[in-house]
């Protein structure tokens, strides 16, 4: 995973103009959709591309799409960077408030998807590892989890579900919660394969 060269960056950046060209041939495209395609790589501080727009010069739907696009890129493998755990991406996005992205939109995004969205690999305080399958709207840090590995990080003979809203303590009566998010691929687990 090496950084992109200047030539590769130039090629990647062409997708915006190429996307706009494709839209020209389509009838009935809503102007908001065209704005998203044209401006989803603009950044709140003017550091984006293709026009270095800043703040409210960037249409609101493009500002939202930029956050989503960045999140999606970071949680997935790319030729130049390995996938990052969703909780770590959320933390990174939070530091980008009022720099790359409008603070209020970042905060709404985090409220919407939660810290550990479905598909996140997590380790619990008892050492078990699983994948988040369903979030709790009321208590974001207490989702339903498909447990896959025991505390010794060995595959469970039978996977099982645990709802952290209902199960608040482990077998030793210690508080049970998410200790940390794990990078995709940790312990050889691929969340995408597990949830299909």
Regions found by a protein language model. Give the residues of each.
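Histidine- and acidic-residue-rich, metal-dependent catalytic cores
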Residues: 1-196
């Amino acid at each position: 995973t090496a950084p992109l060269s200047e030539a590769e960056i130039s090629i990647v950046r062409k997708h915006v103009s190429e996307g706009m060209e494709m839209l020209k041939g389509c009838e009935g495209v809503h102007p908001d959709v065209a704005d998203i395609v044209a401006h989803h790589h603009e950044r709140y501080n003017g550091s984006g591309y293709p026009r270095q727009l800043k703040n409210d010069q960037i249409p609101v739907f493009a500002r939202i799409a930029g956050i989503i696009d960045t999140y999606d890129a970071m949680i997935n493998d790319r030729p130049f960077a390995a996938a990052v755990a969703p909780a770590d991406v959320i933390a990174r996005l939070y530091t980008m408030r009022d720099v790359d992205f409008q603070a209020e939109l970042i905060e709404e995004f985090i409220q919407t998807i939660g810290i550990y969205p479905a598909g996140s690999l997590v380790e619990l305080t008892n050492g078990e590892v699983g994948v988040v399958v369903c979030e709790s709207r009321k208590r974001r840090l207490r989702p339903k989890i498909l447990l896959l590995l025991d505390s010794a990080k060995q595959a469970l003979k039978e996977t099982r579900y645990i709802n952290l809203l209902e199960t608040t303590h482990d077998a030793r009566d210690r508080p049970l919660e998410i200790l940390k998010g794990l990078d995709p691929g940790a312990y050889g687990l691929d969340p995408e394969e597990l949830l299909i």
